Curated annotation (Swiss-Prot):
Pfam families: FSAP_sig_propep
Highest taxon of source: Eukaryota
Keywords: Amidation, Amphibian defense peptide, Antibiotic, Antimicrobial, Cleavage on pair of basic residues, Secreted, Signal
Secretion signal, residue range per the UniProt entry: 1-22
Name the record gives this protein: Dermaseptin-B7
Tissue expression remark: Expressed by the skin glands.
GO cellular component assignments: extracellular region
One GO-annotated biological process of the protein: defense response to bacterium
Comp. bias regions, Acidic residues: 30-40
In-chain residues carrying the UniProt-annotated modification Valine amide: 78
Organism this protein belongs to: Phyllomedusa bicolor (Two-colored leaf frog)
Ranges where the record places region Disordered: 24-48
Known function: Has antimicrobial activity.
Length: 81
């Protein structure tokens, strides 16, 4: 009976040790995944910022060109009269 108790305690102890090791590895993996997600989010934010800035610059250039064309057309129309 005593040897059965010792065996049972040994099995339970080894089970708890392996469980704690697995939980620790799981936490480490979750931390690594979280860091990767943070890095990807930062990259996306940076990329989106660059796209947004380029879009603004393109819109400004297009509006400036359209304004010059309209001004030229008005000037030509006034000059013809």
């Amino acid at each position: 009976m005593a040897s059965l108790k010792k065996s049972l305690f040994l099995v339970l102890f080894l089970g708890l040790v392996s469980l704690s090791i697995c939980e620790e590895e799981k936490r480490e993996n979750e931390d690594e995944e979280e860091q990767e997600d943070d890095e990807q989010s930062e990259m996306k934010r940076g990329l989106w910022s660059n796209i947004k800035t380029a879009g603004k610059e393109a819109a400004k250039a297009a509006l400036k060109a359209a304004g010059k064309a309209a001004l030229g057309a008005v000037t030509d129309a006034v000059g013809e009269q």
